[in-house]
A protein has these predicted regions:
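Surface-exposed, low-complexity loop segments enriched in small/polar and acidic residues
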Residues: 1, 5-7, 11, 15-251, ...
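Residues that define the transmembrane beta-barrel architecture of outer-membrane proteins
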Residues: 2, 92-96, 175-177, 248-254, ...
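Residues on the lipid-exposed face of transmembrane beta-strands in outer-membrane beta-barrel proteins
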Residues: 6-10, 100-104, 181-185, 254-260, ...
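Short loop/turn motifs that connect adjacent beta-strands in outer-membrane beta-barrel proteins
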Residues: 12-16, 105-111, 188-196, 263-275, ...
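Transmembrane beta-strands of outer-membrane beta-barrel proteins
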Residues: 18-20, 111-113, 196-202, 273-279, ...
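Transmembrane beta-strands of outer-membrane beta-barrel pores
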Residues: 24-28, 106-108, 115-123, 187, ...
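C-terminal beta-barrel architecture of Gram-negative outer-membrane proteins
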Residues: 332, 491, 495-596
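C-terminal beta-signal and adjacent terminal beta-strands/loops
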Residues: 396, 405-408, 503-506, 556-568, ...
Length: 645
């Protein structure tokens, strides 16, 4: 990883300054994933003439079976090519940021104007992928060089394996351009309690994104089964088609904010030492999703000098991002449980409950952008206290309650709930058009016999569309304690402790989700969400820092509470997997030179996660919840920073 910045400032005189910033970031990561496997949505047919087909017409035909003389074709839709090796993933990220502006003072007004351009590029390359076309060619050869899918992983020659291995690449690029101007006046006019300030500003933004997929993924090079003649959009084994996508938009915004005192201490009003207000509004116009105006109001009351009571109300707005609006298709491989087939097992007495059902084979989870999305809206209010006791210097306690109601949330239903809805609708004589199934085979018909249910084929694709979902309410409590101990014989100390509790997180249940709940099925991201899927009830962090002359040190601790992972269910109890709490500590020591060649240079030696705590196990890609935990382990670092006047 490389991260570098350059900051420039130049004083023009007359209270005017030019400033600039140049930033560059580059990172490269490598990882491995399991060997490539076929999807039921893109099977491979082994021809009856293939050399290693045990049911074919060639020399390796099995004896003693009632097989036609011309042999049989064999379809494989759940085969993992172990001898091709694990997929090797290389990701390179680069980004840069250019900023130039000017700021100054004109009379009672402070002003600032700048232009910004930033761009980022990600190149995601995966080696040891498999071309379906080349794989089928290798399988259907009519000599011993053919690829054998019916033997141990070591039976095929490396030349044969290499004949169908490919590299697959995806490139993603984003760009942001911005020009703004803002100005403020702390003394716009005076009230009896003091001066009222005003800030105004305007901004223009340009956003752009492009996703360019490999030709074998975006439909340029497709896979046509040479036996059945069926054409599939993707030629990459284990991946559905991914069309290229792009989008851009312009945003014009303006804001105004006014703040000032209504009551001051020298007015000597009982129980109102101070009373301050803030009112603000912001307007935004998007060229793709419309415009909006949102207000904000804040009131701060000091009954006495040491106690502040503050309250606020604000409305918010979030436009769908460009990928949610414009992405044609994104695809992932998932393993949903097919409860319709499970119901057949229950009806026949093969299993007793849904908890005994197993997941399906690999199913393509297709996600589609939606240009008709509406912006999200939110309404939030808060009430807080700040107490600074007069009998202890530099000690502060804070407590803030907050409540947010969000409407028209942009999201996508989980692949499991989409599959569950197919189960519900089939029980009632219909089906879910967003669940694509293969034609029922003779094996499927035999499986459903005696269950009282109509036979169906395996799930092939589950399609999810970004949509505006129902409302969500969230509330919580933030607590803080801060203490500074200055000018002791041992130096200066600072202590900070923060804790956050989620009181409520409730996603409204829509009509489709209510249907599933009535059947006793688990709903993802619906209902009470406290302690569910990355939402621990409690989180906390604490910092202790010390400095003495040129020396300094710090200790940091972080606590993340336990929560349940709804993606994993314990077989013996049927309960969700409990992700344990996690506590880590980090420490550093530093020295700052204040004279000589290295003046204003700081050297820091630190250890992150000093106790080498591993993240708790979760049902995620790498085995842990990346939004809350990390697998970095104990990390020792040495940093050098220099300031130039």
């Amino acid at each position: 990883r490389l991260n570098s910045f350059i900051f420039l400032n130049h004083d023009l005189g007359n209270d005017t300054e030019l400033y600039g910033e140049l930033g560059y970031y580059r990172a490269e990561s490598n990882s491995q994933r399991a060997e490539t496997a076929t999807l039921t949505s893109a099977p491979v047919t082994i021809a009856n003439s293939a050399y290693w087909n045990p049911l074919g017409s060639g020399v390796n035909r099995l004896a003693g079976y009632d097989i036609p003389v011309e042999g049989l074709d064999v379809t494989i839709d759940a085969y993992r090519s172990l001898d091709a090796g694990p997929r090797a993933i290389n990701v390179k990220n680069t980004s840069y940021r250019l900023l130039g502006g000017a700021r100054g003072i004109k009379g009672d007004w402070d002003w600032d104007s700048a232009a910004l351009y930033s761009a980022a590029k990600t190149v995601d390359s995966t080696a040891n992928r498999i071309s379906l076309s080349l794989f089928q060619d290798a399988v259907n050869r009519q000599d011993a060089s053919a690829y054998n899918t019916f033997c141990a992983a070591s039976c095929n020659s490396q030349d044969t394996i290499d004949s169908f291995k490919i590299d697959v690449e995806r490139t993603g690029e984003t760009a942001l351009g911005l020009v703004d101007f803002k100005m403020s006046n702390a003394k716009l006019f005076a009230l009896p309690a003091g001066n009222v300030g005003l800030a105004v500003g305007t901004e223009w933004r340009y956003e752009n994104f492009e996703n360019d997929y490999d030709d074998r993924l975006n439909g340029t090079v497709m896979y046509t089964d040479s036996v059945t003649g069926i054409t599939y959009d993707s030629d990459v084994m284990g991946s559905s088609a991914q069309p290229n996508s792009d989008g851009s938009r312009n945003i014009l915004s303006a804001f105004v904010e006014m703040a000032g005192p209504l009551v001051s201490p020298d007015m000597d009003i009982p129980f109102v030492n101070q009373l301050n207000f803030q009112i603000a509004g912001r307007y935004e116009r998007y060229n793709d999703v419309g415009d909006v105006f949102k207000p904000k109001a804040v009131l701060s009351w000091y009954p006495v000098e040491s106690l502040q009571i503050r309250g606020s109300y604000a409305e918010g707005f979030r436009a769908p991002n460009l990928e949610q609006l414009h992405t044609a298709v994104t695809s992932r491989v998932n393993y949903p449980t097919d409860f319709y087939r499970c119901q057949a097992d229950i009806n026949k007495g093969n299993v007793d409950s849904f908890s005994e059902c197993s997941s399906s084979d690999s199913v393509s989870n297709i996600r589609l952008g939606n240009p008709n999305l509406k912006p999200e809206k939110d309404y939030n209010y808060g009430l807080g206290l700040v107490y600074t006791p007069t009998f202890v210097e530099n000690l502060t306690f804070t407590a803030d309650y907050w409540h947010i109601k969000q409407e028209d949330l942009v999201g996508i239903r989980s692949y499991q709930n989409i599959a569950d809805l197919d189960y519900y609708q089939r029980l009632n004589g219909g089906s879910n058009s967003n669940v694509i199934r293969a034609e029922a085979t003779s094996d499927d018909i035999a499986f459903f016999e005696g269950s009282g249910l109509a036979p169906v084929g395996d799930m092939v694709e589950v399609i999810g569309l970004f949509e505006n979902l129902d409302s969500r309410e969230t509330s919580g409590l933030d607590l803080g304690a801060y203490y500074k101990l200055r000018d002791t014989a041992l130096g200066n100390f600072k202590f900070k402790l923060n804790a956050a509790k989620i009181i409520k997180a409730f996603q409204a249940v829509d009509s489709e989700s209510a249907q599933l709940a009535a059947l006793g099925l688990t709903l993802d991201d619906v209902g009470d969400l406290v302690q569910m899927d990355g939402r621990p009830e409690w989180q906390a962090s604490g910092t202790l820092t010390w400095d003495y002359q040129n020396w300094g040190a710090g200790l940091y601790g972080k606590y993340v509470g336990e929560f349940y992972d709804t993606g994993a269910v314990q077989d013996d109890t049927g309960e969700f997997w409990l992700v344990d709490s996690w506590t880590t500590f980090s420490i550093y020591g530093q020295y700052t030179f204040d004279q000589g060649t290295f003046e204003n240079t700081r050297v820091r030696l630190g250890v992150r996660n000093m106790l080498d705590k591993t993240p708790p196990l979760a049902d995620e890609t790498y085995g842990y919840e990346a939004s809350l935990h990390n697998a970095e382990g104990r990390y020792v670092y040495l940093s050098l920073s220099m300031n130039f006047d």
